[in-house]
Amino acid sequence: MLKENWISSDLLTVNNINEILDKLYNLLYNIGIDSPIMVGVYFYDFKWIYTSDLNYIENYIVQLCNYYGIKFEKKYWDNMDGISYKDINRWCIAINLCEMDYSENKKERYVSEYNYIGDGFNI
């Protein structure tokens, strides 16, 4: 029986992992980091995930967090005992913080670039 805090392939759906990878890929792309993380990669069974894949994800989250100045404690995967909710939460929190920072900066850049006061084009 699985420990309570471990995620089985039934609990972590394809949509969950794809959403995480999709956000990560897009945020990396937005800051100019070309990553081999493929959007739409499907992990049907976590018994088949390679530890190297998990380490790639960790490394790219570290790069993203470093860019935005967000603290992220990298985990080194050397065996595949299971992915815990804590691991998924670490990824999601870090990616969401970077996404919020990116959105806020994007809005500020947009406003400062296009906010022409007096010509009827105000944001």
Regions found by a protein language model. Name each.
Residues 1-123:
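Extracellular "spike/adhesin" assembly and maturation modules
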